Amino acid sequence: MKYLYLITTEGCQGCKIMKDILVNNFSNIRIRVQDINFVPLWIKTNIKLTDFPTLVFIKNDIIRYHFSGTKSARKIKELIETLQF
């Protein structure tokens, strides 16, 4: 199973923007949005979470890629193609 895991924090305007971008442009991919306080430990130990939003590409319970900050839908689509996600 593959999914995009958006890690957010309270009061983060960029997090809201990224959530909207994902929901409106990637209905064919499972999307999970979670506040940093509820992110599973296995993700927290594999990624240094210092900036938000952070988008994690997970496939078969393996982190394939991640980035922090906001990106356009076009850039995310390019990443999905490059990663063959």
Task: Describe the predicted segments one by one.
Residues Y5-T9, S27-W42:
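Thiol-based oxidoreductase modules, predominantly thioredoxin-like and allied folds used
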Residues L41-K48, L83:
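Short amphipathic alpha-helix with an adjacent loop that forms part of the alpha/beta core around
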Residues V56-F85:
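Non-catalytic, surface beta->alpha helical segment in thiol-disulfide oxidoreductase systems
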Residues N46-V56:
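Structural micro-motif
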Residues M1-S27:
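Local sequence-structure signature of Cys/Sec-based thiol-disulfide redox active-site neighborhoods
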Residues K16-M18, R30, I58-N60:
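A structural signal for the main folded, soluble domain(s) of proteins
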Residues M18-D20, P40-I43:
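A generic local structural motif
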